[in-house]
Amino acid sequence: TYYDYQMVTNPAALFSENEVLQILEQMFPVKDAELRDTQTLNVAYGFYLNIITGELYKKNYAKAREYLALVSVTTIPAEIYYIHFNLRYLKNLTYYLYTGKMRYYKEVIAVIDMIESFGDVRLAEGMKKEMLQLTAGRTFNLEKGQFPLNIVTEK
């Protein structure tokens, strides 16, 4: 039920790796997903969001990438856009933190802008704040051709 998923999803980042794997095995695929409402599915799939986010805060980017790989083979209904947007945000944030490549940073910003344009300002603001916390003190790893140019001309 909704509350069963909530009891597991909310503290997800606190579980050990073994506990997470056991829970993933039991929770997914969601049984009778087509019979569940959007709220219940958001909470169920939110488990992935919480375990990935927890690893990012621990700076365990390799583990976050492992969890992203697991969720990539999980079928999440298309109408659960909240989860899809969050996973896209977390995937690009993880890869930015892992590689420092500017293209991932730009994609994070694009996802946040998209969410804001859909009217979910609260979620977008939360993502901006989280991104600033997680990227504080980081420098960009600019790829060839992606660095800013200053053209100096004489008058």
Model-assigned labels for residue ranges:
Residues 1-63:
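Mid-protein regulatory/catalytic core that forms ligand/cofactor-binding pockets
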Residues 15, 58-62, 79, 92, ...:
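Short helix-adjacent coil turns
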Residues 19-22, 62-66, 100-107:
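Alpha-helical positions within canonical tetratricopeptide repeat
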Residues 2-6, 38-46, 77-87, 118-129:
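Alpha-solenoid helical repeat architecture
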Residues 61-75, 81-90:
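Structured C-terminal portions of repeat-based eukaryotic scaffold domains
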Residues 28-35, 68-77, 109-120:
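Amphipathic alpha-helical segments of tetratricopeptide repeats
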Residues 100-155:
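C-terminal non-catalytic interaction modules
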Residues 6-10, 46-54, 86-97, 127-130, ...:
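"A position-specific structural signal for the A-helix of alpha-solenoid helical repeats
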